[in-house]
């Protein structure tokens, strides 16, 4: 499903992926980041003791409705989030997905050698 989502988003420019057409529909860029935040928060952090959060600010920006995890950006205002840039979200997404898949394929064993936030562009 993740590959299909990325394929659908690929022809869109970064500006296209920023648009929030109505308050109840989140931007494409936000959806890509939210999935990565979900993997990081609920799969990687609880299961990999050496895992480091990619960016502490992303929890607020990309949490959808998990109030027990912390505060969040209002849904109607997600289109106002211009940073991080799409390139950084794409890199973070690839790294988080790689780590999640590696962890699942290895039965929960750590694969952190492939994951390093410094490999992604900064905003």
How would you label these PLM feature ranges?
Residues 3-27, 45-53, 102-115:
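Helix-loop segments that flank and shape redox-cofactor active sites
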Residues 16, 21, 47-48, 58, ...:
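Solvent-exposed, flexible loop/coil residues
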Residues 28-71:
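Conserved alpha-helical segments that form or flank metal/cofactor-binding pockets of metalloenzymes
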Residues 17-37, 80-89, 110-123:
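Alpha-helical scaffold segments that form or flank carboxylate-/histidine-based iron centers
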Residues 64-111, 118-121:
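Acidic/histidine-rich alpha-helical segments that form the ligand environment
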Residues 1-11, 33, 37, 91-94:
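Alpha-helical bundle segments that constitute or directly flank the non-heme di-iron/ferroxidase center
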